[in-house]
Amino acid sequence: MRGVRPTLVTRVAVRVIAAVILVSAGFLMVRYASLPWLLPVHFQANGFPNGWQYRTPARVLLPVFVQLALALTLGGIGMLLLSRMHGADEPEAPDVKAAAAAAEAVTLMALIWVAFQAYAAWALVSMWTTERAGFGLSYSYLELSGAVLTGAVAVRAHFRLGHPAPRPFVAEHWRYGQLYKNASDPALFVPTRDGRRWTLNFGRPVAAALLGLILAVGIVGPTIILAILLRGR
């Protein structure tokens, strides 16, 4: 038995993500000494600063922390998606292929936003150095481009996942009519009752872990980043 093998695109994307994070961290550490000891963090309507914070490694490396949070969180989701154990005779099973496609999509989304944070690192250094508000029009264009690319990845994944064939209905495997729960089924992804899309098998603990991790992204992640920003005010 083995887990789902990641696609070539997934493996390449993971390497690129690691390289982007290392380059971002190196750039910020090289520029650290040249930054003002008081970093402008709040600006007036005319673009001049009226609020500062002390320069610290944690503040300067904030884009890298965001990159790491994205990489570790989305990477964790990808690993959970690939955790479906299967035999050597099942590599083409529909749910195995669906897991590989979903993990690829998650990894590509991580790459998009990790790369965006690399530009954010450069924009922050520029803002701190010039002491003028704003990240420039390029920031907005790249942010919009990231959103468009994320949507394109999601659409691509949707077509790759396809429409699974519905399974024979077994009443004890379905809770509240739509929630699939079958601990004896090794699949993480299973067809919905009508076969129109995929759903999770909540009989597997990894499904609960997957939902918990996704919730943590939206709750814990922003809290930690906000704490770093407000530290020392």
Label the predicted regions.
Residues V4-I21, L62:
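Alpha-helical transmembrane segments and their helix-start/interface "positive-inside/aromatic belt" motifs
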Residues R11-A18, T73-I77, A102-A115, P205-L213:
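Select subsegments of transmembrane alpha-helices in polytopic membrane proteins
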Residues A157-P205:
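Membrane-proximal soluble regions of multi-pass membrane proteins
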Residues I17-V20, W52-G75, G136-G151:
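Alpha-helical transmembrane segments
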Residues Y32, L70-E90, A152-R167:
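Membrane-water interface of transmembrane alpha-helices
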Residues I219-R233:
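Juxtamembrane boundary at the C-terminal end of a transmembrane helix
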Residues M29-Q44, A118-W128, L226-L230:
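Membrane-helix interface motif
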Residues L28-V60, L188-V190, R196-L200:
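Active-site and channel-lining beta-strand-loop segments
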